Amino acid sequence: MSHPQFAAELLQRAEKQGPITIGLAGAGQMGTDIVVQVALMPGMRIGAISEVRPQAAIDAALLAGHDRSDIVQAPNAPAIDRAIEGGKIAVTEDLHALAAAGRIDVIIDATGNPNVGTLFALEVMKNGKHIVMLNVEADITIGRFLKEEARKAGVVYTGAAGDEPACTLEIIGFARSLGFNIVAAGKGKNNPLKFDAVPADYEKEAAERNMNARMLVDFF
């Protein structure tokens, strides 16, 4: 699907059924980027954010331009639904509540934790919701299994457009459309190569980039 077509279909969907309501798990660097970008997109809205650090979720929504009065704490699924019905953004510390909330159409996992992401994805599927995996750590480990579980549940399991795997596939598709034979595909390294990097040495840089130090070091 082309980007212009996608934009048009989002508008059509919003006119007929209202915007797609997103539940976001995680408000770190990637999660915050999602909140900010969705605020600019017609046809989508962030309905709820689950984050073990609630202030991080609040800060992400404020950065996206939402008023503080439009951000409410929601301890359980019914509270999340009430917030969404009232046009608010719900902030919860409970991933289970996010998975169970009835007013959410699709979940984005931006936790970056493979164990949490896997268990959460399975719970999301059991609740009949589609899941976008912005958790490459989980996807690369057990994504094939999760894809099959989604098929059994009748929901969609997919990667995130804009993340590196999806961008690589877009480039492959473009090259094939030009008649090229693809023999290899991947990405170049855009971080320093440091074999001895440990999280404790990068706490300050990670905080400045709104990242987990362990994850930052993983890229080195």
Regions found by a protein language model. Give the residues of each.
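Short, ordered loop/turn segments at secondary-structure junctions
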Residues: 27, 51-52, 96, 112-113, ...
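General beta-strand structural signal in soluble alpha/beta enzymes
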Residues: 91-93, 108-109, 133-134, 157-160, ...
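Glycine-enriched alpha-helix->loop->beta-strand junction motifs that scaffold or abut catalytic
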Residues: 103, 127-130
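Core active-site phosphate/anionic-ligand binding loop and the adjoining beta-turn-alpha structural block
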Residues: 144, 151-220
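Rossmann-fold NAD(P)-binding glycine/threonine-rich loop
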Residues: 111-127, 135-156, 160-163
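N-terminal glycine-/serine-/threonine-rich beta1-alpha1-beta2 phosphate-ribose binding loop
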Residues: 1-123
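Generic secondary-structure signature for well-ordered alpha-helical cores
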Residues: 39-43, 55, 62, 66, ...
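Predominant activation on well-ordered alpha-helical scaffold segments within soluble catalytic domains
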Residues: 35-36, 58, 122, 144-148, ...
